[in-house]
């Protein structure tokens, strides 16, 4: 081969170049085989390290995303009241006009001439729901109120919280020593406190009212003091009581003050019921006594009355206080000083007609 190469100089050069190229290629391949396992050995720890590092990083991101979602949900839950507050503020900012206060209308017959034609010398009408006086005629004039006093008697006796089924006996101290009026309840008669309340309010039984006041802790004198104390508490500045029945003309008040008393009494369901009951039968001894309501407007169901009390002595004239419901509204009506019972009833019916027509 050497001799052949010597003979062929050009071929020798070419062959040398080819052999050199093959040797270089073989050396490069062998070097690559040695380096590749070394790189693989180093690549595996790095890959593991990266995987270890990435795994908690992803978890942290996932936790952050979950926390973000929880925080967002909590924010949404707490955002509702804030939005409601904003809506409330917007609602408050744009308030609808206040409803017009009720009033009696001339188109319904309420005129100065009609008021002047009332039989009652003093009259007062109060719309309870709005606190608006609708009619006031001599409403602050002090005058005797007669048996309307028994409404305060009932309020104070009820506040004493004595057992209603307890028995009271009528004594000589319960007789009328002012007007010397009679009574169907004889001295020695016994009735429950419930029956005494019932006939004192419904039929204006004087001895029943007197017995309730005598039964008060401290006696009748303490009871009358409690009546005046309650009047002051209610703001009845022109009111004074001397005794519990109303027989004394020195039991005085005004139509405006009595509207306050009606408001206090109307809070007691028992007083409302007893004052508007039509009739009842009591048994003070061996026999029976039938009592009827002293107010003809209640007896004949002429008006939607929820509470009432009548009163009459010569010094006071005829009077009545009542709580009515007219078209869903509570109305207090006080009438004092009418010359006849028919006159005060006529005034009440007329005022109810004005109310029914005027209230929308």
What are these regions (language model features)?
Residues 3-8, 27-112, 126-135, 139-143, ...:
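Structured C-terminal helix/loop/strand segments within mature extracytoplasmic catalytic/sensor domains
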Residues 9-13:
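N-terminal Sec-pathway targeting helices
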Residues 14-25:
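Bacterial N-terminal signal peptides
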Residues 94-256, 260-269, 326:
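Active-site-adjacent loops and short helices of periplasmic peptidoglycan-processing enzymes
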Residues 120-122, 294, 318-321:
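Short glycine-rich loop/turn motifs
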Residues 174-176, 206, 281, 296-298, ...:
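Active-site/binding-pocket entry motifs
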Residues 220, 224, 251, 290, ...:
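Alpha-helix N-cap/helix-start motif
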Residues 267-301:
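Conserved active-site loop region of the serine DD-peptidase/beta-lactamase
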């Amino acid at each position: 081969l050497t001799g052949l190469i010597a003979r062929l100089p050009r071929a020798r050069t070419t062959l040398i170049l080819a052999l050199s190229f093959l040797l270089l290629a073989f050396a490069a391949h062998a070097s690559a085989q040695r380096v590749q396992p070394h790189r693989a050995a180093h690549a595996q720890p790095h890959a593991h390290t990266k995987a270890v590092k990435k795994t908690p990083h992803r978890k942290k991101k996932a936790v952050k995303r979950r926390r973000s979602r929880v925080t967002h949900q909590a924010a949404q839950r707490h955002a509702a009241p804030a939005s409601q507050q904003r809506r409330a503020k917007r609602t408050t900012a744009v308030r609808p006009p206040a409803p017009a206060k009720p009033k009696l209308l001339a188109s319904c017959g309420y005129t100065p001439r009609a008021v002047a034609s009332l039989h009652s010398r003093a009259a007062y009408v109060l719309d309870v729901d709005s606190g608006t006086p609708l009619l006031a005629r001599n409403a602050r004039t002090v005058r005797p109120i007669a048996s309307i006093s028994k409404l305060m008697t009932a309020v104070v006796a009820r506040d004493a919280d004595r057992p209603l089924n307890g028995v009271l006996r009528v004594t000589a101290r319960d007789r009328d020593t002012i007007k010397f009026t009679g009574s169907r309840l004889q001295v020695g008669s016994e009735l429950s406190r419930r029956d005494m309340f019932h006939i004192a309010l419904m039929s204006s039984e004087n001895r029943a009212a007197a017995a309730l006041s005598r039964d008060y802790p401290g006696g009748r004198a303490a009871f009358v003091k409690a009546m005046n104390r309650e009047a002051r508490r209610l703001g009845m500045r022109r009111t004074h009581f001397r005794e519990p029945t109303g027989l004394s003309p020195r039991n005085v008040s005004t139509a405006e003050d009595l509207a306050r008393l009606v408001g206090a009494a109307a809070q007691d369901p028992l007083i409302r019921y007893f004052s508007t009951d039509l009739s009842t039968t009591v048994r003070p001894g061996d026999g029976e006594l039938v009592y009827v309501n002293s107010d003809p407007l209640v007896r004949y169901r002429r008006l939607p009355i929820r509470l009432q009390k009548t009163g009459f002595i010569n010094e006071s004239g005829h009077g009545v206080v009542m709580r009515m419901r007219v078209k869903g509204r509570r109305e207090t009506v006080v009438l004092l000083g009418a010359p006849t019972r028919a006159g005060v009833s006529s005034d009440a019916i007329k005022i109810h007609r004005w109310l029914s027509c005027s209230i929308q």
